[in-house]
């Protein structure tokens, strides 16, 4: 990693009204107001949110590919790749399991579904039928096989056709191809240098494109939040407020207490990290998709002192294997349904639920509406909990989706710093400077001192 001093004086402070996080906040407020008072019109704005997410997905594959390939090809020892991946998977497995256990414990303590006395036979199962059907495709073997694309191009375009359209890039497939190509490039040595130089030269314009696309974030957040409030209404939260509130509070405590302790042990503050990522978090909140902020998260983590090779491996992998918010939601929602339908679950049933959830949460990687579909897959394997009970939470799932995405996002940001520190691939002075609000020296690609992609402010 080459660091150069900025040429000339630092740029003047950007006015608050031009900062992305302020624009996204205003957009979310306006979208919520429009959804509340003009719900019919607000529903028609859904394409704004969808279009922005498509724009971001368009650039995700190139960002991941370039970051991973240049990072791996620049490593002096290829054993480092396996070591980083192994450490990341150990971290992901531990904290994903911990999140599932936390959801289970909170459900027992809070009892959000107690006293509802719902008869599963009286519920409209047609509302959740499509989710249950999708969940049947989520198997561990199918998930592992899906990591391997049918072709190199297929990883970037999507191999499957849904409603006559290609599904788009698969993050894990792009990761798989990028790792193989990066290793191959490193093995050919000097002969691969021209290719590596070309890919490194492409990084700056690609991240500049990310910066340009992020300027449309307020429009996307406005459309997405207006649609959500307009379609589902704030009123739908009232009946299930105890469940929604329990989930939000549990996720907050998980981030501040559990992840907070991890951050403190690693020498930084989770609150400062959240402040540093405020623009991305607001974007995730507005679009209800942590994927929408993936490119800028990778950029921000590298800017904060994490080595590019570690960022390139940990962040995309974490988006599939480190879903803390989704895991909390799964066990909490499953026990809520059991309590609401007066279904008694023994300790054995709950251990089985935990084991199935550990596997099914990995099988939902990259699936739209992953939390709800994964819950359906889990309940289908644990027959004691009626799948029909999912109809109880269908109306508020969209409101819990934001919290799932935010928790997943923060969890992956923390994981990136922790694994970087674990791997001695973290510039601690730079991290401290950035989290304290300072402007660090520019990061420059090899051979191009002083040139760096514009970081999202």
UniProtKB/Swiss-Prot annotation:
Pfam family membership, one: SDF
UniProt record, GO biological process: L-aspartate transmembrane transport
Entry's localization field: Cell inner membrane
Similarity section: Belongs to the dicarboxylate/amino acid:cation symporter (DAACS) (TC 2.A.23) family.
Record-level Gene Ontology MF annotations: fumarate transmembrane transporter activity; malate:proton symporter activity; succinate transmembrane transporter activity
Protein origin, superkingdom: Bacteria
Function: Responsible for the transport of dicarboxylates such as succinate, fumarate, and malate from the periplasm across the membrane.
TM annotation in the entry: 22-42, 55-75, 90-110, 138-158, 168-188, 209-229, 242-262, 335-357, 376-396
A GO-annotated cellular component: plasma membrane
Name assigned to this protein: C4-dicarboxylate transport protein
Record's keyword terms, sorted: Cell inner membrane, Cell membrane, Membrane, Symport, Transmembrane, Transmembrane helix, Transport
InterPro entries for the chain: C4_dicarb_transport, Na-dicarboxylate_symporter, Na-dicarboxylate_symporter_CS, Na:dicarbo_symporter_sf
Organism: Xanthomonas oryzae pv. oryzae (strain KACC10331 / KXO85)
Membrane topology: Multi-pass membrane protein
């Amino acid at each position: 990693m080459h660091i150069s001093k900025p040429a000339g004086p630092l740029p003047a402070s950007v006015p608050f009204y031009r900062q992305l996080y302020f624009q996204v906040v205003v957009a979310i407020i306006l979208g919520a107001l429009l959804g509340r008072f003009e719900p019919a019109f607000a529903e028609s704005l859904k394409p704004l949110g969808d279009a922005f997410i498509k724009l971001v997905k368009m650039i995700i594959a190139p960002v991941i590919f370039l970051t991973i390939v240049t990072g791996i090809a620049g490593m002096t020892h290829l054993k480092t790749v396996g070591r980083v991946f192994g450490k990341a998977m150990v971290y992901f497995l531990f904290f994903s399991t911990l999140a599932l256990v936390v959801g289970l414990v909170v459900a027992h303590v809070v009892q959000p579904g107690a006293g509802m006395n719902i008869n599963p036979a009286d519920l409209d199962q047609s509302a959740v039928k499509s989710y249950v059907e999708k969940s049947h495709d989520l198997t561990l073997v199918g998930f592992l096989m899906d990591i391997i694309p049918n072709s190199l191009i297929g990883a970037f375009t999507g191999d499957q056709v849904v409603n006559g359209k290609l599904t788009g890039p698969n993050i894990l497939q792009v990761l798989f191809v990028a790792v193989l190509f990066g290793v191959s490039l490193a093995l050919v040595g000097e002969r691969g240098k021209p290719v590596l130089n070309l890919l490194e030269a492409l990084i700056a314009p690609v991240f500049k494109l990310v910066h340009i696309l992020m300027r449309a974030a307020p429009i996307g957040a406005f459309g997405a939040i207006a649609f959500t409030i307009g379609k589902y209404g704030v009123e739908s939260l009232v009946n299930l407020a105890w469940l929604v509130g329990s989930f939000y509070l549990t996720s907050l405590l998980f981030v501040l207490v559990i992840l907070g302790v991890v951050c403190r042990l690693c020498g930084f503050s989770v609150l400062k990290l959240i402040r540093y990522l405020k623009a991305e978090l607001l974007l995730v909140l507005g679009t209800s998709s942590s994927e929408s902020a993936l490119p800028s998260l990778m950029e921000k983590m590298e800017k904060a002192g994490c080595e590019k090779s570690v960022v390139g491996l940990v962040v995309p992998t974490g988006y599939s294997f480190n879903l803390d918010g989704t895991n909390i939601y799964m066990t909490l929602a499953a026990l809520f349904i059991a309590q609401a339908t007066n279904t008694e679950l023994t300790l054995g049933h709950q251990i089985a639920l935990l084991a199935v959830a550990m596997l099914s949460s990995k099988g939902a990687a990259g699936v739209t509406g992953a939390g709800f579909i994964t819950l359906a897959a889990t309940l289908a394997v644990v027959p004691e909990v009626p799948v029909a009970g999912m109809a109880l939470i269908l109306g508020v799932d969209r409101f819990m989706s934001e919290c799932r995405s935010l928790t997943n996002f923060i969890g992956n940001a923390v994981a990136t710093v922790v694994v970087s520190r674990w791997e001695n691939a973290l510039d601690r002075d730079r991290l401290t400077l950035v989290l304290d609000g300072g402007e660090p020296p520019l990061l420059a690609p090899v051979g191009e001192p002083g040139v760096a992609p514009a970081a999202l402010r």
